[in-house]
Amino acid sequence: MAFPETITMDMARRRFFLRSGSGFGMAALAGLLADKPANAASATPQPHFTPRAKRVIYLHMIGAPSHLDLFENKPELVKRDGQECPESLLKGRRFAFIGGKMTLAGSRFQFQKKGRSGQELSNLLPHLCTVADEIAIVKTVHTEEINHAPAQMFLHTGFGRGGRPSIGSWLNYGLGSETENLPAYVVLLSGPLGGAGTTLWSSGFLPSVNQGIQFRTSGDPVLFLSNPQGQTREDRTQILQSINQLNSRRLATAGDPEIATRISQYEMAFRMQASVPDLMDISRETPATLASYGAKPGAASFANNCLLARRMIERGVRVVELYDADWDHHNSLERSLPRKAADVDQPMAALVRDLKQRGLLEETLVIWGAEFGRTPLRQGIDGDGKTVNPGRDHHKDAFCFWMAGGGIKGGITLGKTDDFGFAPVENPVHVHDLNATVLHLMGLDHEKLTFKYQGREYRLTDVHGNVVRELLA
Protein backbone atom coordinates (compact mmCIF):
# COMPACT_ATOMS: atom_id res chain seq x y z
CA MET A 1 0.00 0.00 0.00
CA ALA A 2 1.35 3.45 -0.94
CA PHE A 3 1.65 6.20 1.66
CA PRO A 4 -0.40 9.43 1.05
CA GLU A 5 2.78 11.50 0.53
CA THR A 6 3.95 9.05 -2.11
CA ILE A 7 0.63 9.25 -3.96
CA THR A 8 0.67 13.06 -3.86
CA MET A 9 4.25 13.21 -5.16
CA ASP A 10 3.44 10.71 -7.90
CA MET A 11 0.39 12.72 -9.03
CA ALA A 12 2.41 15.93 -9.07
CA ARG A 13 5.12 14.22 -11.08
CA ARG A 14 2.58 12.97 -13.63
CA ARG A 15 1.01 16.42 -14.00
CA PHE A 16 4.47 17.86 -14.62
CA PHE A 17 5.25 15.31 -17.32
CA LEU A 18 1.84 15.73 -18.93
CA ARG A 19 2.24 19.49 -19.21
CA SER A 20 5.81 19.09 -20.48
CA GLY A 21 5.20 16.18 -22.84
CA SER A 22 5.69 18.15 -26.02
CA GLY A 23 8.76 19.75 -24.54
CA PHE A 24 10.34 16.36 -23.94
CA GLY A 25 9.64 15.36 -27.52
CA MET A 26 11.38 18.52 -28.72
CA ALA A 27 14.26 18.03 -26.29
CA ALA A 28 14.76 14.48 -27.50
CA LEU A 29 14.77 15.61 -31.10
CA ALA A 30 17.12 18.51 -30.39
CA GLY A 31 19.58 16.16 -28.73
CA LEU A 32 19.22 13.75 -31.62
CA LEU A 33 19.99 16.36 -34.27
CA ALA A 34 23.01 17.41 -32.24
CA ASP A 35 24.26 13.77 -32.33
CA LYS A 36 23.47 13.37 -28.65
CA PRO A 37 20.68 11.05 -27.45
CA ALA A 38 18.05 12.52 -25.15
CA ASN A 39 18.93 10.08 -22.39
CA ALA A 40 22.69 10.65 -22.63
CA ALA A 41 22.80 12.07 -19.12
CA SER A 42 21.36 8.89 -17.59
CA ALA A 43 23.76 6.79 -15.56
CA THR A 44 25.63 4.06 -17.44
CA PRO A 45 25.72 0.71 -15.59
CA GLN A 46 29.12 -0.02 -14.07
CA PRO A 47 30.98 -3.35 -13.87
CA HIS A 48 31.31 -5.06 -10.51
CA PHE A 49 35.11 -4.99 -10.80
CA THR A 50 37.80 -4.03 -13.30
CA PRO A 51 37.09 -5.92 -16.54
CA ARG A 52 39.70 -7.80 -18.55
CA ALA A 53 37.65 -7.34 -21.73
CA LYS A 54 35.40 -4.53 -22.94
CA ARG A 55 33.78 -6.23 -25.92
CA VAL A 56 32.79 -9.71 -27.12
CA ILE A 57 32.77 -11.27 -30.58
CA TYR A 58 30.91 -14.58 -30.39
CA LEU A 59 31.24 -17.01 -33.32
CA HIS A 60 28.46 -19.61 -33.14
CA MET A 61 28.49 -22.53 -35.56
CA ILE A 62 24.81 -23.50 -36.00
CA GLY A 63 24.30 -27.25 -36.06
CA ALA A 64 27.45 -28.19 -34.12
CA PRO A 65 30.75 -29.05 -35.86
CA SER A 66 32.51 -32.33 -35.22
CA HIS A 67 35.10 -31.39 -32.60
CA LEU A 68 36.55 -34.90 -33.02
CA ASP A 69 37.63 -33.94 -36.54
CA LEU A 70 38.78 -30.40 -35.71
CA PHE A 71 40.23 -30.19 -32.18
CA GLU A 72 40.21 -33.62 -30.49
CA ASN A 73 42.84 -36.06 -31.75
CA LYS A 74 41.90 -39.54 -30.50
CA PRO A 75 44.44 -42.15 -31.72
CA GLU A 76 42.66 -44.99 -29.89
CA LEU A 77 39.38 -44.07 -31.57
CA VAL A 78 41.14 -44.07 -34.95
CA LYS A 79 42.74 -47.43 -34.15
CA ARG A 80 39.36 -48.97 -33.35
CA ASP A 81 37.45 -47.28 -36.16
CA GLY A 82 34.60 -49.49 -37.40
CA GLN A 83 34.57 -51.72 -34.32
CA GLU A 84 31.48 -52.16 -32.21
CA CYS A 85 31.45 -49.77 -29.25
CA PRO A 86 31.89 -51.43 -25.83
CA GLU A 87 28.65 -51.41 -23.86
CA SER A 88 30.43 -49.85 -20.88
CA LEU A 89 30.99 -46.63 -22.85
CA LEU A 90 27.31 -46.33 -23.75
CA LYS A 91 25.78 -46.89 -20.33
CA GLY A 92 23.59 -43.96 -19.25
CA ARG A 93 24.17 -41.94 -22.44
CA ARG A 94 21.45 -40.28 -24.52
CA PHE A 95 21.67 -39.75 -28.25
CA ALA A 96 19.32 -37.79 -30.49
CA PHE A 97 18.92 -40.16 -33.44
CA ILE A 98 21.51 -42.88 -33.59
CA GLY A 99 20.35 -46.38 -32.68
CA GLY A 100 20.89 -50.06 -33.33
CA LYS A 101 24.46 -51.19 -33.73
CA MET A 102 26.87 -48.64 -32.25
CA THR A 103 30.08 -48.42 -34.27
CA LEU A 104 33.14 -46.40 -33.27
CA ALA A 105 34.18 -43.69 -35.73
CA GLY A 106 37.75 -42.44 -35.81
CA SER A 107 38.60 -39.25 -37.64
CA ARG A 108 39.72 -39.51 -41.26
CA PHE A 109 41.65 -36.25 -40.96
CA GLN A 110 45.19 -35.61 -39.76
CA PHE A 111 46.22 -33.54 -36.73
CA GLN A 112 49.33 -31.43 -36.23
CA LYS A 113 50.94 -29.64 -33.30
CA LYS A 114 51.31 -25.97 -34.04
CA GLY A 115 52.88 -22.87 -32.51
CA ARG A 116 55.27 -22.60 -29.59
CA SER A 117 52.51 -23.99 -27.39
CA GLY A 118 52.09 -27.15 -29.46
CA GLN A 119 48.32 -26.77 -29.82
CA GLU A 120 47.00 -29.82 -31.67
CA LEU A 121 44.67 -28.87 -34.53
CA SER A 122 43.20 -30.63 -37.55
CA ASN A 123 44.69 -30.10 -41.00
CA LEU A 124 41.24 -28.76 -41.93
CA LEU A 125 42.21 -25.57 -40.06
CA PRO A 126 45.55 -24.45 -41.58
CA HIS A 127 44.84 -20.74 -41.03
CA LEU A 128 43.75 -21.13 -37.41
CA CYS A 129 47.00 -23.02 -36.85
CA THR A 130 48.86 -19.74 -37.50
CA VAL A 131 47.27 -18.16 -34.39
CA ALA A 132 47.49 -21.29 -32.23
CA ASP A 133 49.43 -19.43 -29.53
CA GLU A 134 46.63 -16.87 -29.17
CA ILE A 135 43.79 -19.28 -28.51
CA ALA A 136 42.80 -21.40 -25.52
CA ILE A 137 41.01 -24.63 -26.42
CA VAL A 138 38.54 -26.05 -23.89
CA LYS A 139 37.98 -29.75 -24.64
CA THR A 140 35.53 -30.66 -21.89
CA VAL A 141 32.52 -28.39 -22.36
CA HIS A 142 29.25 -30.20 -21.63
CA THR A 143 25.57 -29.28 -21.64
CA GLU A 144 22.14 -30.63 -20.66
CA GLU A 145 20.35 -30.72 -24.01
CA ILE A 146 20.71 -33.07 -27.00
CA ASN A 147 18.63 -31.28 -29.65
CA HIS A 148 19.53 -28.09 -31.46
CA ALA A 149 16.94 -25.52 -30.37
CA PRO A 150 16.97 -26.39 -26.64
CA ALA A 151 20.78 -26.67 -26.62
CA GLN A 152 21.21 -23.34 -28.41
CA MET A 153 18.89 -21.66 -25.91
CA PHE A 154 20.66 -23.35 -23.00
CA LEU A 155 24.03 -22.09 -24.23
CA HIS A 156 22.84 -18.52 -24.77
CA THR A 157 20.32 -18.09 -21.95
CA GLY A 158 21.16 -20.75 -19.36
CA PHE A 159 17.78 -22.45 -19.89
CA GLY A 160 16.58 -24.88 -22.54
CA ARG A 161 13.26 -23.16 -23.19
CA GLY A 162 12.38 -19.74 -24.56
CA GLY A 163 11.64 -16.58 -22.62
CA ARG A 164 14.95 -15.82 -20.94
CA PRO A 165 17.52 -13.18 -21.93
CA SER A 166 20.52 -14.08 -24.08
CA ILE A 167 24.07 -13.59 -22.86
CA GLY A 168 24.41 -10.54 -25.13
CA SER A 169 21.33 -8.99 -23.53
CA TRP A 170 22.69 -9.69 -20.04
CA LEU A 171 25.97 -7.98 -20.99
CA ASN A 172 24.09 -4.99 -22.39
CA TYR A 173 21.93 -4.82 -19.25
CA GLY A 174 24.95 -5.07 -16.95
CA LEU A 175 27.29 -2.69 -18.78
CA GLY A 176 25.22 -0.42 -21.00
CA SER A 177 26.27 0.95 -24.37
CA GLU A 178 29.54 2.58 -25.44
CA THR A 179 28.12 4.07 -28.62
CA GLU A 180 25.38 6.59 -29.36
CA ASN A 181 25.03 5.81 -33.05
CA LEU A 182 24.85 2.00 -33.12
CA PRO A 183 23.16 -0.71 -31.05
CA ALA A 184 25.19 -2.20 -28.21
CA TYR A 185 24.38 -5.74 -29.36
CA VAL A 186 24.46 -6.71 -33.06
CA VAL A 187 23.82 -10.05 -34.77
CA LEU A 188 25.09 -11.14 -38.21
CA LEU A 189 24.04 -14.31 -40.06
CA SER A 190 25.69 -16.38 -42.79
CA GLY A 191 23.19 -18.97 -43.98
CA PRO A 192 19.73 -19.87 -42.64
CA LEU A 193 19.32 -19.52 -38.89
CA GLY A 194 17.14 -22.55 -38.05
CA GLY A 195 17.13 -24.03 -34.56
CA ALA A 196 15.97 -21.64 -31.85
CA GLY A 197 15.74 -18.70 -34.25
CA THR A 198 15.66 -15.13 -33.03
CA THR A 199 15.14 -16.20 -29.40
CA LEU A 200 18.94 -16.52 -29.31
CA TRP A 201 19.33 -12.75 -29.15
CA SER A 202 16.10 -11.97 -27.32
CA SER A 203 16.10 -9.73 -24.25
CA GLY A 204 13.53 -12.03 -22.62
CA PHE A 205 12.15 -10.38 -19.50
CA LEU A 206 14.88 -7.71 -19.46
CA PRO A 207 13.93 -4.26 -20.82
CA SER A 208 13.74 -4.54 -24.60
CA VAL A 209 16.49 -1.93 -25.04
CA ASN A 210 18.86 -4.86 -24.35
CA GLN A 211 17.66 -6.88 -27.35
CA GLY A 212 20.12 -7.85 -30.07
CA ILE A 213 19.63 -6.18 -33.46
CA GLN A 214 20.15 -8.20 -36.63
CA PHE A 215 22.13 -6.50 -39.41
CA ARG A 216 21.93 -7.82 -42.97
CA THR A 217 24.82 -7.80 -45.42
CA SER A 218 22.66 -7.25 -48.50
CA GLY A 219 19.87 -4.76 -49.11
CA ASP A 220 19.00 -2.52 -46.17
CA PRO A 221 21.38 -3.50 -43.32
CA VAL A 222 18.47 -3.00 -40.92
CA LEU A 223 14.93 -3.52 -42.17
CA PHE A 224 12.98 -0.29 -42.76
CA LEU A 225 15.99 1.86 -41.83
CA SER A 226 16.04 3.75 -45.13
CA ASN A 227 13.51 6.49 -45.82
CA PRO A 228 10.52 5.34 -47.91
CA GLN A 229 10.63 6.37 -51.55
CA GLY A 230 9.72 10.03 -51.94
CA GLN A 231 10.39 10.89 -48.28
CA THR A 232 13.27 13.17 -47.28
CA ARG A 233 15.30 13.29 -44.08
CA GLU A 234 13.44 16.50 -43.19
CA ASP A 235 10.13 14.62 -43.54
CA ARG A 236 11.48 11.92 -41.22
CA THR A 237 12.51 14.59 -38.71
CA GLN A 238 8.99 16.00 -38.55
CA ILE A 239 7.46 12.53 -38.17
CA LEU A 240 9.93 11.66 -35.42
CA GLN A 241 9.13 14.90 -33.60
CA SER A 242 5.40 14.10 -33.61
CA ILE A 243 5.95 10.50 -32.50
CA ASN A 244 8.22 11.62 -29.67
CA GLN A 245 5.59 14.05 -28.44
CA LEU A 246 2.95 11.31 -28.35
CA ASN A 247 5.28 8.82 -26.70
CA SER A 248 6.42 11.35 -24.11
CA ARG A 249 2.84 12.10 -23.12
CA ARG A 250 2.07 8.41 -22.83
CA LEU A 251 5.22 7.88 -20.77
CA ALA A 252 4.04 10.59 -18.38
CA THR A 253 0.69 8.88 -17.79
CA ALA A 254 1.79 5.23 -17.81
CA GLY A 255 5.36 5.44 -16.51
CA ASP A 256 6.19 2.34 -18.59
CA PRO A 257 9.96 2.04 -19.22
CA GLU A 258 9.20 0.29 -22.51
CA ILE A 259 7.84 3.60 -23.82
CA ALA A 260 11.16 5.25 -22.96
CA THR A 261 12.83 2.41 -24.84
CA ARG A 262 10.59 3.09 -27.84
CA ILE A 263 11.59 6.76 -27.82
CA SER A 264 15.29 5.88 -27.73
CA GLN A 265 14.84 3.29 -30.50
CA TYR A 266 13.29 5.89 -32.83
CA GLU A 267 16.19 8.21 -32.06
CA MET A 268 18.73 5.44 -32.63
CA ALA A 269 17.15 4.50 -35.96
CA PHE A 270 17.42 8.13 -37.09
CA ARG A 271 21.12 8.30 -36.20
CA MET A 272 21.78 4.91 -37.78
CA GLN A 273 20.65 6.24 -41.15
CA ALA A 274 23.96 8.11 -41.16
CA SER A 275 26.23 5.70 -39.26
CA VAL A 276 25.25 2.28 -40.67
CA PRO A 277 25.97 2.76 -44.40
CA ASP A 278 29.55 3.79 -43.60
CA LEU A 279 29.96 0.89 -41.16
CA MET A 280 28.72 -1.75 -43.60
CA ASP A 281 30.80 -0.54 -46.56
CA ILE A 282 33.78 -2.89 -46.37
CA SER A 283 35.06 -1.62 -49.73
CA ARG A 284 36.70 1.11 -47.62
CA GLU A 285 39.13 -1.52 -46.30
CA THR A 286 42.51 -1.98 -47.96
CA PRO A 287 42.88 -4.75 -50.57
CA ALA A 288 45.33 -6.47 -48.21
CA THR A 289 42.79 -6.54 -45.38
CA LEU A 290 40.03 -7.86 -47.65
CA ALA A 291 42.36 -10.57 -48.93
CA SER A 292 43.43 -11.60 -45.43
CA TYR A 293 39.80 -12.29 -44.47
CA GLY A 294 38.78 -13.63 -47.88
CA ALA A 295 36.09 -10.93 -47.85
CA LYS A 296 34.33 -9.63 -50.95
CA PRO A 297 32.29 -6.40 -50.85
CA GLY A 298 28.62 -7.05 -51.51
CA ALA A 299 28.75 -10.76 -50.67
CA ALA A 300 26.87 -12.43 -47.84
CA SER A 301 29.52 -14.54 -46.14
CA PHE A 302 31.10 -15.46 -42.84
CA ALA A 303 34.30 -13.78 -44.06
CA ASN A 304 32.50 -10.46 -44.59
CA ASN A 305 30.81 -10.82 -41.21
CA CYS A 306 34.14 -11.35 -39.41
CA LEU A 307 35.48 -8.17 -40.97
CA LEU A 308 32.28 -6.32 -40.07
CA ALA A 309 32.61 -7.56 -36.49
CA ARG A 310 36.00 -5.88 -36.23
CA ARG A 311 34.59 -2.66 -37.71
CA MET A 312 31.72 -2.75 -35.23
CA ILE A 313 33.81 -3.16 -32.11
CA GLU A 314 36.04 -0.32 -33.34
CA ARG A 315 32.92 1.86 -33.30
CA GLY A 316 31.90 0.88 -29.79
CA VAL A 317 29.47 -2.02 -30.29
CA ARG A 318 29.82 -4.11 -27.13
CA VAL A 319 28.61 -7.52 -28.34
CA VAL A 320 28.76 -8.83 -31.91
CA GLU A 321 27.43 -12.32 -32.50
CA LEU A 322 28.03 -14.21 -35.74
CA TYR A 323 25.92 -17.25 -36.62
CA ASP A 324 27.20 -19.54 -39.38
CA ALA A 325 24.86 -22.28 -40.63
CA ASP A 326 25.09 -25.83 -42.03
CA TRP A 327 27.24 -27.68 -39.49
CA ASP A 328 24.76 -30.48 -38.70
CA HIS A 329 26.62 -33.38 -40.33
CA HIS A 330 24.63 -36.53 -39.55
CA ASN A 331 25.89 -37.90 -42.86
CA SER A 332 28.40 -37.09 -45.60
CA LEU A 333 30.79 -35.67 -43.00
CA GLU A 334 33.94 -36.41 -45.03
CA ARG A 335 32.61 -34.25 -47.85
CA SER A 336 30.74 -31.56 -45.90
CA LEU A 337 33.10 -30.80 -43.02
CA PRO A 338 36.11 -29.76 -45.16
CA ARG A 339 33.86 -27.37 -47.11
CA LYS A 340 32.47 -25.76 -43.95
CA ALA A 341 35.88 -25.62 -42.27
CA ALA A 342 37.23 -23.79 -45.32
CA ASP A 343 34.39 -21.25 -45.02
CA VAL A 344 35.40 -20.19 -41.51
CA ASP A 345 39.08 -21.06 -41.09
CA GLN A 346 40.68 -18.12 -42.90
CA PRO A 347 38.32 -15.35 -41.68
CA MET A 348 38.35 -16.33 -38.01
CA ALA A 349 42.14 -16.57 -38.00
CA ALA A 350 42.32 -13.21 -39.79
CA LEU A 351 39.99 -11.72 -37.18
CA VAL A 352 42.25 -12.76 -34.30
CA ARG A 353 45.36 -11.55 -36.12
CA ASP A 354 43.75 -8.26 -37.22
CA LEU A 355 42.52 -7.48 -33.71
CA LYS A 356 46.01 -8.11 -32.34
CA GLN A 357 47.71 -5.93 -34.95
CA ARG A 358 45.34 -3.06 -34.15
CA GLY A 359 45.83 -3.37 -30.40
CA LEU A 360 42.23 -4.50 -29.88
CA LEU A 361 42.67 -8.16 -28.94
CA GLU A 362 43.63 -7.46 -25.33
CA GLU A 363 40.25 -5.88 -24.67
CA THR A 364 38.14 -7.99 -27.05
CA LEU A 365 37.04 -11.50 -26.07
CA VAL A 366 36.64 -13.79 -29.09
CA ILE A 367 34.63 -16.99 -28.52
CA TRP A 368 34.10 -19.88 -30.96
CA GLY A 369 31.75 -22.78 -30.32
CA ALA A 370 28.37 -24.42 -30.80
CA GLU A 371 25.44 -25.86 -28.88
CA PHE A 372 27.05 -29.31 -28.48
CA GLY A 373 29.51 -31.63 -30.23
CA ARG A 374 29.32 -34.85 -32.25
CA THR A 375 29.45 -38.50 -31.18
CA PRO A 376 32.51 -40.76 -31.36
CA LEU A 377 30.03 -43.12 -33.05
CA ARG A 378 29.33 -43.48 -36.73
CA GLN A 379 25.89 -42.53 -37.99
CA GLY A 380 24.45 -43.61 -41.34
CA ILE A 381 24.57 -47.41 -41.21
CA ASP A 382 22.15 -49.48 -43.31
CA GLY A 383 20.45 -52.74 -42.33
CA ASP A 384 23.44 -54.80 -43.46
CA GLY A 385 25.76 -52.91 -41.12
CA LYS A 386 27.50 -51.06 -43.94
CA THR A 387 28.10 -47.35 -43.68
CA VAL A 388 26.50 -45.11 -46.27
CA ASN A 389 27.91 -41.56 -46.36
CA PRO A 390 28.58 -41.66 -42.61
CA GLY A 391 28.37 -38.75 -40.21
CA ARG A 392 28.05 -38.23 -36.46
CA ASP A 393 25.06 -37.71 -34.14
CA HIS A 394 24.64 -34.99 -31.49
CA HIS A 395 26.83 -35.30 -28.41
CA LYS A 396 26.20 -33.24 -25.27
CA ASP A 397 28.69 -34.81 -22.86
CA ALA A 398 31.98 -33.43 -24.23
CA PHE A 399 32.79 -30.91 -26.94
CA CYS A 400 35.20 -28.06 -27.67
CA PHE A 401 35.23 -24.28 -27.50
CA TRP A 402 38.11 -21.94 -28.18
CA MET A 403 38.60 -18.43 -26.82
CA ALA A 404 41.13 -15.68 -27.45
CA GLY A 405 42.00 -12.16 -26.28
CA GLY A 406 40.31 -10.26 -23.45
CA GLY A 407 42.02 -11.82 -20.43
CA ILE A 408 42.33 -15.35 -21.86
CA LYS A 409 45.56 -17.31 -21.43
CA GLY A 410 46.52 -18.06 -25.03
CA GLY A 411 48.24 -21.24 -26.17
CA ILE A 412 46.70 -23.56 -23.59
CA THR A 413 44.48 -26.62 -23.81
CA LEU A 414 42.14 -27.11 -20.88
CA GLY A 415 40.53 -30.40 -19.98
CA LYS A 416 40.88 -33.99 -21.06
CA THR A 417 38.35 -36.56 -22.23
CA ASP A 418 38.55 -40.37 -22.25
CA ASP A 419 40.34 -42.21 -25.06
CA PHE A 420 37.24 -42.14 -27.23
CA GLY A 421 36.02 -38.62 -26.48
CA PHE A 422 32.80 -39.65 -24.76
CA ALA A 423 33.21 -37.75 -21.49
CA PRO A 424 35.57 -35.50 -19.49
CA VAL A 425 38.09 -37.12 -17.19
CA GLU A 426 39.87 -33.87 -16.18
CA ASN A 427 38.59 -30.28 -15.75
CA PRO A 428 34.97 -30.60 -16.91
CA VAL A 429 33.49 -27.23 -17.94
CA HIS A 430 29.72 -26.92 -17.86
CA VAL A 431 27.99 -24.35 -20.08
CA HIS A 432 27.11 -22.43 -16.89
CA ASP A 433 30.84 -22.32 -16.03
CA LEU A 434 31.62 -21.03 -19.51
CA ASN A 435 29.04 -18.23 -19.21
CA ALA A 436 30.19 -17.34 -15.69
CA THR A 437 33.71 -16.96 -17.09
CA VAL A 438 32.59 -14.71 -19.95
CA LEU A 439 30.76 -12.42 -17.51
CA HIS A 440 33.80 -12.40 -15.20
CA LEU A 441 36.12 -11.32 -18.01
CA MET A 442 33.71 -8.46 -18.75
CA GLY A 443 33.85 -7.31 -15.13
CA LEU A 444 30.55 -8.85 -14.00
CA ASP A 445 29.92 -11.23 -11.12
CA HIS A 446 27.50 -13.84 -12.47
CA GLU A 447 25.95 -14.25 -9.00
CA LYS A 448 25.28 -10.51 -8.65
CA LEU A 449 24.02 -9.77 -12.16
CA THR A 450 20.34 -10.42 -11.49
CA PHE A 451 16.90 -9.24 -12.55
CA LYS A 452 13.71 -9.70 -10.56
CA TYR A 453 10.86 -11.13 -12.60
CA GLN A 454 7.57 -12.54 -11.32
CA GLY A 455 8.86 -12.51 -7.76
CA ARG A 456 12.13 -14.33 -8.43
CA GLU A 457 15.69 -13.10 -8.96
CA TYR A 458 17.01 -14.52 -12.24
CA ARG A 459 20.55 -14.67 -13.58
CA LEU A 460 22.24 -16.04 -16.70
CA THR A 461 23.76 -18.99 -14.85
CA ASP A 462 20.55 -19.76 -12.90
CA VAL A 463 21.81 -21.13 -9.54
CA HIS A 464 24.94 -22.75 -10.99
CA GLY A 465 28.29 -21.90 -12.54
CA ASN A 466 31.87 -21.28 -11.48
CA VAL A 467 34.48 -19.09 -13.14
CA VAL A 468 37.06 -21.26 -14.95
CA ARG A 469 40.15 -19.59 -13.52
CA GLU A 470 42.56 -21.85 -15.40
CA LEU A 471 41.59 -19.93 -18.55
CA LEU A 472 42.48 -16.52 -17.14
CA ALA A 473 45.74 -14.84 -18.13
PLM region descriptions:
Residues 1-473:
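Ligand-binding pockets and gating/stacking loops
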